[in-house]
Amino acid sequence: MMKRNNEGIGGEGVANSPPDDTQQKRRRIQFEAVKMPAVQSVTELRSRTVAIQAAKLRQTVLIKNKRISDLERENERAKRRQLTDESNFLKVYNLFSELEKFIWAQTKDEFGEVKMTPSAPAGTDVQGMTSEQYHSFVDTAKGNLRIAFNSYAKARHDRTTETANFIARLKTLMADPKLNINDIHKELAAKTASLLAQIDKLQAEAHRVQSENHNLERKRRHMVDKNTLLESRIQEMEKLLEEAHFETEKQMRLACKYEARLILEHEAASGNATASSSATLNQSEKKMGSPGSPPSESTSREIEALRADRDEQAAIAARRLQELEDTNRKLQSMAQDISKLKMETQSSVPSDVITNSEEYRNLKKYYSLAIKEHERICKDLEDVTVERDQLRSVKENREKMMSEEHQKTIKEIQHQSEIHNTFYRVSHDSEVLRAEFETVKEEYNKTVKQSEWDEMKATVNTLRSLNKTMKSQMQRMKDREKASQKEHSAVKTELKTLKDQLEKSVLVPLEDSGNTSTEDANKIRAEYESLKREIRRIGAMDKQEKQRQLDREIQRHIADKVTELETLRKTNEALTNDEQTLSDELEVVCLTIEEEQERNAQLFMEKRDQEDRNLKMMNERMIQNQVQSRMREKLECLESKAQTDAQIAKMHEFEKKASDEVLNKLTENLQFKTSEVTRLSNMMEVHRKQTQELGFARDENQVKVDRCEAQLKQYQDLYGSKSREVEEAKFKRQRAEEELELVRVKYERAKRNDSAQTGDQVLQEANRQMKETLTCPSCKTRPKDCIMLKCYHLFCETCIKTMYDTRQRKCPKCNSNFGANDFHRIFI
């Protein structure tokens, strides 16, 4: 018989739906084959259908309750994730507020009392703010930072004014002829020595802070890499968990189906046992409708195996869920460690180093950059929150799409199984009807048109061909989807490796070395300068070639990967188009199948009506035969005995054939299920081996990465030690050159003093030497009014600007490089 399952919205029946709405009808109507024993009346038929419908409804209610419990667990997990995200947001906000308090405290400790705005709100208050309140709070924070930096700049300006006053006082003392010049020189030397000591101390502290920041940045990158690996592992585990859910749901449906069949078989067996005392004709009709045999041992073993497989799948799903929870806890602990490291980096720098680390000139230049950096960080925080919300929405949409796809595949599989069952049911019903037709033809000489049987055979053949085409199309679509997924995963891995290579590569910008011409003081200095330029030229040439080679390799790799991405995008578009066409064809095929099913239903209804008419005619003939039997009782009794014996023999033969057919069908079904179970077990074993191989490959890559990081650290330490040795040698050489120059000047001065005859000539010579010290050594005409902040050599501003504009950005005395922010004007 046919069972109609109405799952419309609001309890609407299928009869109320319009006849032309095929899509809605296909969604609401579902056919399922159910084997029932023979019945004596219409009421018994209705009662059996109601019982079967109630069993099916119980199955659906069980499945829906399990789905509801799964969705509730997912909701709780999503709530926990939301709480972790909110806690991370509060941690980030608290870090920013502590940074602002630290800046305020530093400005207050160094420069006295500062007018401060009200204290910043807590993280929970910020979480409950509106967008306008949050923007106003950000503006006030920016104003607080601006006031702090203004006060810091004012203090630095006061310090520079004090130094300027000191220099002016020295000028006045130098202009006074009564004062001794040696005392002034001693004061200047002491002041210069103190400043140089302070500068050396600041440089050492800056180097230390930079090295610490570099180490912390490396640790942060390492933690980020670990985090990305764990996220990918979580995604893989989620996919495996979804597959396990799908398999458990499938096995649960099969188990419910087999349990319902067992119940029906037991009911049929009990019904046959109670009806054994009835008439022989009714008993033969019941046996023709259903053999009523209890379930065999093979079917019970199959059901037990399916139940054990279902329990195993549930245990695997529980273990995987526990692993996911463990990884989530590890991620939370890692996030807490990262926040602690950030707090340690912010609190490790002492206040004395911050207060004495920079001068007024550098602070004035970098003030605008600090404000822009703060704004950028605020924008980045907003972008991160927006991106987090977008990722959540994308993930939810993706989960919905995946659930819809799973539902579609389940419906397609159910539809195929229903077609398969209807095919077997129709074949069995056709054989039973053929036997009934032969018996009725022998008794009452009734015939059925051969055209109806031909039409039913044609429909069965069409259903078989449609089933084969649908299976081939489904296999083709699955193969295409697997190929596209493999290509997509390969492209992702290649992009990830390229990004890692770009992050690990170090690009060192090099400046062109310019040839500087200086006056040869003596023969030794000229030879030394020429050798130094030659060595520097050779070193710069090698570095440039290496840099060019690296740039070419990187550009080539990027171009290759971009082309591969374009080709993959095109293939993906082609695959989506093919999938759309296949889905359209599948919908057309489904519509045709539904039309054929409706036609078959109409034919079955007509056949039932014909059978009812035949039964009525049979009853009338029986009454007539009873009236006539009074006249010829003996003859009819003998004839009836002969006929009943022949009928019993035929019925026994038919029962044997039916039992053989049922046994063959059960064996075929068992073979099909066993082959499917073996195939699933093989697939699970292959996937398990693949996951193990991937885990081994991941461990090997991790070992390689650790080894490369250790080698990189060794090379960095070696490079730092060598660079420090080179800088110390360079500094010693510069000091020796300066001492040599001072000795030469003293020697020339002593020589000139010996040659001078009177005291006036001595004073003139001293004045001339003082003018030479105050004039620019490059142009010999203009006074010294500009200082190099790296080497502290004095020149005129015009000479330094011409050197900067002509790209000869090296100090004429020590050949040290300088930039736009490395020279400043002074007043002597």
From Swiss-Prot:
Intracellular or extracellular location(s): Nucleus
Top-level taxon: Eukaryota
Biased segments, Low complexity type: 269-298
GO CC aspect terms: HULC complex; membrane; nucleus
Regions annotated as coiled coil: 53-92, 185-251, 311-345, 460-616, 660-756
Zinc finger RING-type: from-to: 776-815
E.C. code: 2.3.2.27
Region (Disordered): 1-25, 269-304
The entry's keywords: Chromatin regulator, Coiled coil, Metal-binding, Nucleus, Transferase, Ubl conjugation pathway, Zinc, Zinc-finger
UniProt keyword Iron present: no
Hydrolase among keywords: no
Molecular function terms from GO: ubiquitin conjugating enzyme binding; ubiquitin protein ligase activity; zinc ion binding
Pathway membership: Protein modification; protein ubiquitination
Region of interest: Interaction with ubc-1: 1-309
Family of the protein in this entry: Belongs to the BRE1 family.
Primary role: E3 ubiquitin-protein ligase that mediates monoubiquitination of 'Lys-117' of histone H2B. H2B 'Lys-117' ubiquitination gives a specific tag for epigenetic transcriptional activation and is also prerequisite for histone H3 'Lys-4' and 'Lys-79' methylation. Involved in regulating stem cell proliferative fate.
Protein name stated in the entry: E3 ubiquitin-protein ligase bre-1
Organism: Caenorhabditis briggsae
